[in-house]
Amino acid sequence: MKKMLLFSFVAFIGLNACSQEKQVSPHETAVGSNISVRYGRPYKKGRDIFGGLVPYGKVYRLGADSATTITFDRDVEFAGKPVKAGTYTLFVIPNKESWTIILNGQLGQWGAYSYDKYKDKDILHVNVPVKKTDKMVEQLTISFPESSMLIEWDQTQVTVPVRFS
């Protein structure tokens, strides 16, 4: 009986310790004026990112774990296209010279695995240019400088113009 209790106690402690482990890719909410993005922030860790870990020409969740979401508090022009206030799932299709940015109305997706099932809920597709930089960004970063959404990772930078109505 004592062995059974000891085994149960050790198993409980082990499971409890595992459940408190920190996520490998921490999550962050990037906040700008009237806009926020919730995303997992994976690290480069010496890997080739675009064209490697993240293949060209394939839908990508733009982060880690759950699909990235973007929330607009007011109606907006996103890369020159009108978008109603609300929360959307944010996907990209990266290519060497440009990215396709996708806003999708289906929330609660895990990664991009179900994208094909919900692509009929796409709100927007826009193409934006890619800029290669000398600056190495170790961890995927989304920020909101001066009327834009800036995506940086590895030596890649993508800027999406944002203008509120």
Where are these regions (language model features)?
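Residue-level marker of positions within ordered structural domains that often coincide
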Residues: L6, I93, D154
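Primarily secretory-pathway and cell-envelope proteins
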Residues: Q20-K58, G108-S165
